Amino acid sequence: MKKTLIFALLLALLLSLVACAAAPTETTAPTTEPTIPSQSPEEEEVFKILMIGQSHAQDASWLVCDVLSAEMPDKKFLVADIYQPLHLDQHIKNIKENNAVYDYAEITNGSNLVKTPNYTINVAVKKHQWDLIVFNEATWPQTEEASYTDGDFQWLTDWLRENAAWPHFKFAYNATWAQPISKENYAIGRQTAPDGFRGTYNEKFGGDRTKHFARICELMEKYVETDPDYDYVFHSGTAIQYASETFGVPEGDPERRYELYRDYTHMSDFGRLIVAYQWYCQIFGIEELKEVKVNVIPSHMRTKCAMSYGDLTIDDTMKQAIIESVNYALKNPNIAPPQTARETPVLEPLG
């Protein structure tokens, strides 16, 4: 009897110990967010941007380093552009086949420009630990819904995350500008669109640049701005649309200083500078642009059709246009500006 009682007590004690061991242990230790690995010291001291795309992408990024280094002279910047006039599906094909068909350009503080031909996107994404990678589709495909629903955008995003040298980069989409068609549209440049392009444009938008712009904005809001993969959407097209509708090209502008477009679809130096300031404000969270510190675009940084004119001095008329256009886009990213063209005075070059 006594042995049975002792055995029962021991069994009860053993079961109690097992139950205690199985119970979850509560802890009051604070939980911590996973830390993002730092870049290497030599990479961390330079803010680095890679732009992937075609001619509209090149227009958008070309003067960004000049703007950043003028506005933030104590910091180091590198802006690279990998260019080939292709749509996204063709870029993806070249990535999969590792085709060396791209022109690669790096721009650093002081308008230092180094170009390298026969490059691959595969090499470019690993060349530096990029802080920001930007992509845009060409202006025309940006108006096609299929461009956003065929899976190519997601494929590129996933591939970049898996293959970039630093996978914690920020990702941005650059929303481009609507295309003018004829010299009658203000601030468009010296050339008109080819007949075939003009026919397609007129068929789809009735030759109305405002309708073209509205379509881009509609699809940006529907597909890109709601996509969590993008940290930024740069509203370059809105800033250009405002400048196009507000600041007219004056007569007697032989050096093409005040034009926004150099042809029927591409930016002039002035247009590129407006877009660069749009990027600057959005990247660094500047809610209102109050001053433009870029005073000169060196001749070697100008578009090919304008290099022969030498350096481009950015006068007060241009600076005011930049400030107004960028601030409009910051406050009204997807809203067409009113058509209130004013006469732009012709000022003598300052230098």
Which sequence ranges carry the predicted segments?
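Alpha-helical cap/lid subdomain in secreted, periplasmic
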Residues: 118-265, 269
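Conserved catalytic region of serine esterases and O-acyltransferases that act on ester linkages
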Residues: 255-351
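Positively charged n-region of N-terminal signal peptides that target proteins for export
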Residues: 1-4, 9
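Short hydrophobic segments within beta-strands
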Residues: 50-52, 174
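Bacterial signal peptide processing site
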Residues: 21-23
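C-terminal motif of bacterial Sec signal peptides marking the signal peptidase cleavage site
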Residues: 16-19
